[in-house]
Amino acid sequence: MAVAAAAAAGPVFWRRLLGLLPGRPGLAALLGRLSDRLGRNRDRQRRRSPWLLLAPLLSPAVPQVTSPPCCLCPEGVHRFQWIRNLVPEFGVSSSHVRVLSSPAEFFELMKGQIRVAKRRVVMASLYLGTGPLEQELVDCLESTLEKSLQAKFPSNLKVSILLDFTRGSRGRKNSRTMLLPLLRRFPEQVRVSLFHTPHLRGLLRLLIPERFNETIGLQHIKVYLFDNSVILSGANLSDSYFTNRQDRYVFLQDCAEIADFFTELVDAVGDVSLQLQGDDTVQVVDGMVHPYKGDRAEYCKAANKRVMDVINSARTRQQMLHAQTFHSNSLLTQEDAAAAGDRRPAPDTWIYPLIQMKPFEIQIDEIVTETLLTEAERGAKVYLTTGYFNLTQAYMDLVLGTRAEYQILLASPEVNGFFGAKGVAGAIPAAYVHIERQFFSEVCSLGQQERVQLQEYWRRGWTFHAKGLWLYLAGSSLPCLTLIGSPNFGYRSVHRDLEAQIAIVTENQALQQQLHQEQEQLYLRSGVVSSATFEQPSRQVKLWVKMVTPLIKNFF
């Protein structure tokens, strides 16, 4: 008992000490990192071993596939059925899935969907920018809300927006001030929730400067939902994401069950967030523990229950729904079945929502991603992309220790979102170069250059923010699975932030071709990384950046 108490007290001690260090970001980062390590027994057990080829054996076992009578997919349709043991499984026709390719297409689709929304608009993002394009989006919302009130038969249109508190409150003009007019004009229809991480509290919250407080933890989910249609993306609601910041986007059209799930998920996170008021103050939901003034353990426990209730109830609901569907279908005549098929095509594509909220002890995305990497067999190809190359130790070990081929796409320094930034932030691209070089050196030292290849995205006048993966089974020229959403595969995504993405599994060749073309378009703008890459003058990393990077890499 005493040992457990001492272990639990360790992180508290370091964080209290951290709070006494104003103006010393380097030392503060060091102590914060020590605090994290003291509290992460699981991660310590995963530290790199020289026996890298044993990585598949050391990784989590694939969850056992069960075959309840209510399962959506008959055995053998696809090998990823085990995911349904963790999350709800949504079967859809591939004709309802469209892959978008550009920021402009993303922006125009959002505006168009807002204009025709009748029942609900739900938007979750890190922040809303303050420029003219963002104002155009707000104006679309205002116009649609106005029409809903003036219609002959007024609709019950509701708008729910979830943003991060720290990022959305930065500066005098910010996400909050952009949304206040909507909130004041339509108080019964508009809800704005601002998530505040429970780990930013006390002296730490008072002393960390505005821009740096975001490193402690964020609301990072990106979901844009209009009635029964959903866009899943990694893009934020900001002008660059509408013009020249490359990301990924998938549009799920008329998928009511998926839209219901993400509405409930955003509502759940919204309920444990601070509620923006018309006077620009914030309030906690009645009966909810305050995220940074209340007891942290109690708050996290309540948040875990709220989110897991959504996941588990949706999973049960889907099982029951599909059990009824299959039972009904078995009683239909051939003509009835054909007629039913005209109304709702048989599913050839399966959607799995993967949620990662480590502050609330929810690690579904981490489990699924590690299992996918573990199970990728010899001859399979994994195309993995991230705008910020900073893989967790577990992901790195799996890439280096398993048998599939990997092509990893990352941002060249010039298209990194921090390139040219003022102050300390301007050194972040160099820190990523340092991390990239260390990983490349390890690949070479293990003789894995043929199996694991790094590629850098470059496009004049653009930045790069795409993340996710495409999985090609051995012998296949098209992907059967993709992960798309907000996670970056880095420490922050796994441990600090709230994340959501979806796994799309499809046997439809046309949709597989869409995903393949998406992958090809991104990789075509890249160059292969070699030893010569790091000899270029632009890749020289200053000594102080090399020294600081290990101390701060868990914060970005």
Swiss-Prot record:
SUPFAM superfamilies: Phospholipase D/nuclease (SSF56024). Residues 215-241, 460-493 form the PLD phosphodiesterase domain. CDD domains: PLDc_PGS1_euk_1, PLDc_PGS1_euk_2. It catalyses: a CDP-1,2-diacyl-sn-glycerol + sn-glycerol 3-phosphate = a 1,2-diacyl-sn-glycero-3-phospho-(1'-sn-glycero-3'-phosphate) + CMP + H(+). The active site is at 220, 222, 227. Keywords: ATP-binding, Lipid biosynthesis, Lipid metabolism, Mitochondrion, Nucleotide-binding, Phospholipid biosynthesis, Phospholipid metabolism, Phosphoprotein, Repeat, Transferase, Transit peptide. The modification Phosphoserine is found at residue 49. GO terms for biological process: cardiolipin biosynthetic process; diacylglycerol metabolic process; phosphatidylglycerol biosynthetic process. ATP binds at residues 124-131. Its EC number is 2.7.8.5. It is an enzyme of class 2 (transferase). GO terms for cellular component: endoplasmic reticulum; mitochondrial inner membrane; mitochondrion. GO terms for molecular function: ATP binding; calcium ion binding; CDP-diacylglycerol-glycerol-3-phosphate 3-phosphatidyltransferase activity. InterPro entries: PGS1 (IPR016270), PLipase_D/transphosphatidylase (IPR001736). Pathway: Phospholipid metabolism; phosphatidylglycerol biosynthesis; phosphatidylglycerol from CDP-diacylglycerol: step 1/2. Residues 1-28 form a transit peptide. Activated by calcium and magnesium and inhibited by other bivalent cations. It is found in: Mitochondrion. Coiled coil: none annotated. Its main location: mitochondrion. Belongs to the CDP-alcohol phosphatidyltransferase class-II family. Functions in the biosynthesis of the anionic phospholipids phosphatidylglycerol and cardiolipin. PANTHER family: CDP-DIACYLGLYCEROL--GLYCEROL-3-PHOSPHATE 3-PHOSPHATIDYLTRANSFERASE, MITOCHONDRIAL (PTHR12586:SF1), CDP-DIACYLGLYCEROL--SERINE O-PHOSPHATIDYLTRANSFERASE (PTHR12586). This is CDP-diacylglycerol--glycerol-3-phosphate 3-phosphatidyltransferase, mitochondrial.
